[in-house]
């Protein structure tokens, strides 16, 4: 008893995911999106490194060595209290110490343009995150609506099954009084079996859509998952659809894929400047401080550090004369990339228009289908109710009854499908205008 109670409480406490819940969770956990964020972090590091390259570099160095001269016969002579002492030290030590700096003063603005280029790359990485997020949100919305539709389809199929069961029971009663053949009853039984099959198929499709949605959310397949069922009213499906031109004009200004393609053009222009700088001279400066010590010098370490200290400052000018066409090739390739970027902008705008046009056509087409199917369901329901009464009175045969039932079921399913497809495409059109997805 306690186990049953715990199971009941667990089932009742299972979370129902709204569309917003699904989107918010995916934005934090989807692996593809996390990979895009890592690319952005990498681009940020590239930008920081290029900015640091504008500054001088500084390094310190030291070298310590020890040597041994086994055949050395003379050494260092000292006089102490009138006594002459000679010390032969076959082992000796040397040390050098240095501090060096270098700075590229000017290289045709290559360094500064590289900073600008890496800033553009960083912006593009950020836009790529937005592109990935938008794509995931669209897929989530599509799967979410498919799940809503399949839930409704299962409900309609179950209602159809109940009707089939009643018809089958009524057929058995009519058979007993001799007013129906066994062949006609078999058709009613087959209809009931077909409705049961339709339910199984719809439930299988529902499970598949849920699995796809869980995969987008990075939820393991063994975790319980179900969505919140919002009230999708007929008024939502009948709402006004924005014009194709207004959606496209707005999308051109806010969609990250368009902005990203335009940044490709900026990137190619900067690469052109960097390539052209290969024809210009490079001015560099170097400086250094150094000293050295040795055990054979006869003076102490501190004195040697001071005596041997030296400082240096230098400048170098590198003028390119012939580089085996490397610079010319880089310039030409940058020009090719610029032309490619222009074509990519046109292609992205074309793809955007095609996508929006598809959603707009689907929204309008399904809305018209929905309006038509509403009256069709009413008429088919009235027709089937009349057929059912006439069948019970023996005025209609089994074929006419089953035909009427099939027409009603098809009309109900068409109404559901057109309703949810209209709502989905309306939401996607709003999404392309910068609004959040919601049902």
Language model feature labels by segment:
Residues 6-8:
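N-terminal signal peptide c-region/cleavage motif recognized by signal peptidases
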Residues 61-103, 230-240, 273, 286-319, ...:
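Small/polar, glycine/serine/threonine/aspartate-rich low-complexity segments that form flexible
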Residues 34-38, 51-52, 91, 105-133, ...:
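Sec/SRP-type N-terminal targeting helices
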Residues 11-63, 69, 221, 227-266, ...:
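Bacterial Sec-pathway N-terminal export signals of envelope proteins
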Residues 194-219, 374-435:
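Short segments within alpha-helical structural elements
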Residues 45, 135-250, 362, 366, ...:
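Periplasmic alpha-helical coiled-coil/stalk elements that build and connect Gram-negative outer-membrane
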